[in-house]
Every structure is written in structure tokens, then in C-alpha cells.
């Protein structure tokens, strides 16, 4: 297995809306794995919105579904919900959709503000080469929606050493992993798995634990009992 650790500087922050959000759009404190993989795929599929996946169509990010991804904050941030003018016509009854009064609405949208702050993303895989992984990492331009610009400051690539047992981590992990010791900095969230890349299909919900404080937003170290973890440049990422 190989890994890449990507050090990103966020221009203002990021916004990734929670699954099934509609009139209200709360956001995540950290971008989920599917978002991170989507950001990675941009370097190879820039300008391609969908691809043929046999008898269905979907996001090009589906080709990288075998890559494991996680993230942590390197800087402190703040979560807020801004008032945004959004299209809401597709939530209206059919007879209302042509009425200009019901085209737009004022929607509270979750955002993490962290101007010039740093986000660290780790990818672990054995499905692509080191050279391709590093190239794709340097090609990341945003995290989340298209306005969430990011600059890659550095990319570290190396061999991911598989370990198990008790390790300490600041990266998020699935809630099936047992946390030992202090548990006051844990936030439980529901992400989607990779079927969310397929048009017309809903990704199955997957529960994760974020070791983070909510105000200010800051990643914290926790100790866990891991079945599958990897040492990546002096840190540990946990996947089961």
C-alpha cells in the first residue's frame, strides 16, 4: 500500500452539505471521503461531468472508489450557516415551478470558515502508482463546492505501513472503531459511501467519528483500538 499526505491551504474554507438536505442545508465540519476522492479525480477528469459505467452513468470519481481517504484540520476554524439565495423550484408542486415567485429561496447553508487555514488529507491505496497518485494530489484545486478554492502547499508520498492495535489519531474514522480513553472530543456524523457517485442512486449512509472540538473547530488526538490502520509519515490513519 502507498499513501499520499496532501497539505492544503484553504482560501476561505469549505462547504459540504449533509446528505438529504433540502430547505435547510447544514454542512459537515470536515469533508467526507467521497468529497476528498472527488477532489482527487479532478486532475484526471477535469471538464468531464459524467461517464458511462456500463448500464448507468455516474461521476468520474467512481473510478477511484478503491482509494481510502480521511482528513483533519491543521488550523482552527469556525462553523456557521450563511444565508444563501438558492434555486428551490424543484421542491415545488408542478403547477408552481413556472412561477418566478417560487424559483429562488433564502436557504441557510453550512460553511466552515478558515481563511488561509490548512487542511491535511491522506489517501491510501494500492490501485494506482506512486507517480500517478502524486500527480493527482498536486492537481487538487478545490474541496467541496466549486467556490471552495484550495492551494496545494506540499505532497508527501510513501509506503503505508499497516498496523493494528492501539494507536492515536487526529483523522476521522468509522464509528465501528473502538475509542479508548477520553471521549469528550467526538462528533458522530453520517457520510455516504461510493454508490452516491452513480446518478439516480442514493449512497448508503455510513457513520463516522470526528475527533474534533466544535468551537473553535479543531482536530484533536484520540486513542483507538484499530483492526486496520496505517502509519503515514509519523501519524496514523484508521479505517477499521
Curated annotation (Swiss-Prot):
Note: Cloning was done with strain P2, while interaction experiments were done with genes cloned from strain P2 but over-expressed in P1. The aCascade complex was purified from strain P1.
Organism: Saccharolobus solfataricus (strain ATCC 35092 / DSM 1617 / JCM 11322 / P2) (Sulfolobus solfataricus)
InterPro entries in UniProt: CRISPR-assoc_prot_Cas5_N, CRISPR-assoc_prot_Cas5a-typ, CRISPR_Cas5_sf
UniProt subunit comment: Part of the aCascade ribonucleoprotein complex, minimally composed of Csa2 and Cas5a, which binds crRNA. Other possible components of aCascade in strain P1 are Cas6b (SSO1437) and Csa5 (SSO1443), while SSO1399, Cas5b (SSO1400) and SSO1401 have sometimes been seen weakly associated. Csa2 is probably the major RNA-binding subunit. The Csa2-Cas5a-crRNA complex also binds target DNA homologous to crRNA, probably forming an R-loop. Purified aCascade forms a filament about 6 nm in width.
Lineage: Archaea, Thermoproteota, Thermoprotei, Sulfolobales, Sulfolobaceae
Gene3D superfamilies: 3.30.70.3120
Protein name: CRISPR system aCascade subunit Cas5 1
Name of the gene: cas5a
Keywords recorded for this protein, A-Z: Antiviral defense, RNA-binding
Single Gene Ontology MF annotation: RNA binding
Purpose: CRISPR (clustered regularly interspaced short palindromic repeat) is an adaptive immune system that provides protection against mobile genetic elements (viruses, transposable elements and conjugative plasmids). CRISPR clusters contain spacers, sequences complementary to antecedent mobile elements, and target invading nucleic acids. CRISPR clusters are transcribed and processed into CRISPR RNA (crRNA).
Domain of life where this protein originates: Archaea
Family classification: Belongs to the CRISPR-associated protein Cas5 family. Subtype I-A/Apern subfamily.
GO biological process, one term: defense response to virus
Presence of keyword RNA-binding: yes
